Regions:
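Short histidine-centered loop motifs in beta-beta connectors
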Residues: 43, 223, 228-231
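Short Pro/Gly-enriched beta-strand edge/turn motifs at strand-loop
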Residues: 67-69, 196-199, 211, 257-262
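Short, surface-exposed secondary-structure edge patches
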Residues: 47-51, 229, 270
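Pseudouridine synthases involved in rRNA/tRNA modification
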Residues: 1-32, 79-84, 206-210, 223, ...
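RNA pseudouridine synthases
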Residues: 1-194, 221, 298-308
Length: 314
C-alpha cells in the first residue's frame, strides 16, 4: 500500500494525479483497481474523475511491482514474475502459453509480453532492435496459446492468417449449465457496450453489430457443469464468454457474464476458459512459412479438465 499526500496547488483529476505519480499505471489498470476498492481518497472510494487538491490523502492498495517501484538492474521487463513458457519456437515465431490472471501486455510489470522478453533476455537471445510482437490477444482471465512474431514478415503472415480465419482456434471451457443440443454452431451478432465494458449478443443484425460464429461440442458433463470444446470461427471481443452466456450456459468463473453465486461457491478467481489449440492450414503458399503447414500446437490441459472428467468439479 502507498499513501500519497497531495501537494498540488491546483485541483487535478484523481486518475491524472495517479498516472503522474506512477507512469506505469494506465486508465485500464486504474479502473480495475477502483472496481476492486484498491483506491481510496480521504478514506473513501471516489470516481477517478474526482478532483484532488492540496491536503487530500490518497491510498492505493497495489503491489510495489504493479506501481513500478521496484529497483531494476537491466530492462524494465525483468520485473515480470517469471519467464514465459514456450510451446514452440522457430526463427519466425513463438507460441507462448499465457497463465490466467496476467494481461498479454499493458502498463503492468507482469505481462505475457514481458515474460517472453525476460526469457529471451535470460537466455541471451534478446534483441532490443527487433523484439517479438504480439499477433493477437487473450483476455486477462483466459489462459492458453498466444502467437508472437519475431520478424515483420512473420507478423504480417500471422495477423493476416488469423484475420482470414486460416488458423483454427480451439478452446476448452467449463460452463455452468449443460448446453442443448450438446453440439451446435451458434450464429449471432455482437455489439459493444463501452460504458459498461461488456458486449451484448443479438439474434438479429443492427447498425454497428458484427456477426459472430461460435461452434461447440460437449466433451463431458458433471452435475450442473459441462466441459466444452469450442471453435472460435470469428474472433470478437469476449465472443465465447458472451455467446455461451446468451444460451444460458455462462463460463464458470466469469465475473462479467457468469453466475457469480456459483463462482463464489466454487471459489473461482478466473474464468474456466483456455485457448487450447492453434492449427495451421495444411497448405501454405508462402515458402518462408511452409514448414508450419499442418502443424497443430496445444497448451497443457487446464486443471478443470480432469476435475470435470472425474466428477470432482460439479
Amino acid at each position: 500500500m502507498q499513501e500519497l499526500h497531495v501537494k498540488s496547488l491546483l485541483p487535478v483529476r484523481l486518475d491524472k494525479y495517479l498516472m503522474e505519480q506512477y507512469p506505469c499505471l494506465g486508465p485500464g489498470r486504474l479502473n480495475k483497481a477502483l472496481r476492486e476498492n484498491k483506491i481510496k481518497l480521504n478514506g473513501k472510494k471516489q470516481p477517478l474523475s474526482t478532483r484532488v487538491q492540496n491536503g487530500d490523502v490518497v491510498r492505493i492498495y497495489l503491489l510495489d511491482e504493479q506501481l513500478g517501484l521496484l529497483p531494476q538492474d537491466g530492462p524494465a521487463f525483468l520485473a515480470a514474475r517469471a519467464p514465459a513458457e514456450f510451446i514452440y519456437e522457430n526463427n519466425e515465431l513463438i507460441v507462448a502459453n499465457k497463465p490466467a490472471g496476467i494481461p498479454v501486455d499493458g502498463g503492468e510489470a507482469d505481462t505475457l509480453l514481458n515474460r517472453v522478453l525476460r526469457r529471451l533476455y535470460e537466455e541471451q537471445r534478446y534483441d532490443a532492435a527487433h523484439p517479438p510482437r504480439l499477433c493477437h490477444r487473450l483476455d486477462t482471465g483466459t489462459s492458453g496459446l498466444v502467437l508472437l512474431a519475431k520478424t515483420s514478415e512473420a507478423e504480417h503472415f500471422l495477423v493476416e492468417s488469423i484475420r482470414e480465419r486460416k488458423i483454427r482456434k480451439t478452446y476448452l471451457c467449463v460452463t455452468f449449465g449443460r448446453p442443448m443440443p450438446p453440439a451446435a454452431t451458434l450464429h449471432s451478432f455482437l455489439t459493444k457496450d463501452s460504458v459498461n465494458g461488456i458486449v451484448r449478443v443479438l439474434d438479429e443484425p443492427k447498425s454497428g453489430a458484427k456477426e459472430i460464429i461460435t461452434g461447440y461440442d460437449t466433451i463431458a458433463v458433471s452435475g450442473r457443469l459441462a466441459l466444452l470444446r469450442v471453435e472460435l470461427v470469428t474472433g470478437r471481443t469476449h465472443q465465447i464468454r458472451a455467446h455461451l452466456a446468451s444460451i444460458g450456459c455462462p463460463i464458470l468463473g466469469d465475473s462479467k457474464y457468469g453466475n457469480n453465486a456459483a463462482n463464489r461457491e466454487l471459489k473461482l478467481k478466473y474464468q474456466a476458459l483456455c485457448a487450447w489449440e492453434l492449427a495451421f492450414p495444411r497448405q501454405i503458399s508462402d515458402p518462408r512459412f511452409a514448414s508450419l503447414a499442418g502443424k497443430v500446437f496445444r497448451a497443457p490441459k487446464p486443471w478443470y479438465y480432469e476435475q470435470v472428467m472425474n466428477g470432482t468439479l460439479r
